[in-house]
Regions:
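Conserved beta-strand signature within the Rossmann-like core of class I S-adenosyl-L-methionine
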Residues: 114-124
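Core SAM-dependent methyltransferase catalytic element
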Residues: 162-190
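S-adenosyl-L-methionine
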Residues: 1-24
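Short alpha-helix
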Residues: 135-151
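Class I SAM-dependent methyltransferase SAM/SAH-binding core
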Residues: 37, 41-79
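Conserved class I S-adenosyl-L-methionine
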Residues: 27-35
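Helix-to-beta-strand junctions that scaffold the AdoMet/dcAdoMet cofactor pocket
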Residues: 110-112
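A short acidic, Gly/Pro-enriched loop at the edge of an enzyme's catalytic core
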Residues: 81-91
Length: 190
């Protein structure tokens, strides 16, 4: 695979990710369901080596770049197994993707001081279009509940309507493992 230099297009970066990614401590970050790699490139620009995982080889080709290791894995295939060891990642980033059977293993892959940034669609999004299948929509408070159930400390959580990049109902969370230093969670000023 040819590595090419790609600029980070800050207009396409999730505002949630842009806001909270600076909390991720030094170390490797997983961009799960990375698509074309917009967030992977942003994370590299912050100094992190990134594993960009997706099931689509064409998307991974677009995601490839300096500091990014691409990984072609279909985590929804029958018999699929989570490919990463517990405690591996300083950060895990997921946007616009939900496959509930992955959650426990994914959270276990966070380092003791790791940061989880997750943003995806919620029930009610049907009124705005796809996804509309309940399998791909979080129930009210679901993301917050599973973060707490898995021992994460919530730094920020939102559940509601967004207008950008298109109107949608979403839930999003910034949560940290228990060893994350509380003083490091510098909250942005408005």
């Amino acid at each position: 695979m040819q590595v090419t230099e790609q600029l980070v297009d800050t207009e396409t970066i999730s505002g949630w990710l842009r806001r909270w990614a600076p909390l991720i401590p030094g170390g490797e970050v997983l961009d799960l369901a990375c698509g074309s790699g917009r967030h992977a490139r942003h994370l590299v620009s912050l100094g992190h080596p990134v594993i960009a995982l997706d099931h689509d080889p064409e998307m991974l080709e677009k995601a490839a770049g300096a500091g990014i290791t691409t990984s072609l894995v279909d985590l929804e295939a029958p018999g699929a197994v989570w490919p990463f060891a517990p405690g591996r990642f300083a950060g895990i980033v997921v946007t616009n993707y939900l496959h509930r059977p992955l959650l426990e293993a994914m959270i276990a892959s966070l380092a003791p001081d790791g940061v989880l940034l997750y943003e995806t669609f919620a029930e009610g999004n049907e009124q705005f279009g796809k996804p509309s299948n309940p399998k791909f929509l979080l129930k009210e408070g679901e993301m917050l509940a599973w973060a707490l159930e898995h021992g994460l400390r919530v730094v920020a959580y939102e559940d509601g309507r967004v207008e950008q990049p298109k109107a949608a109902l979403v839930q999003r969370i910034c949560a940290v493992r228990p060893d994350f230093p509380r003083l490091a969670a510098l909250l942005p000023t408005f």
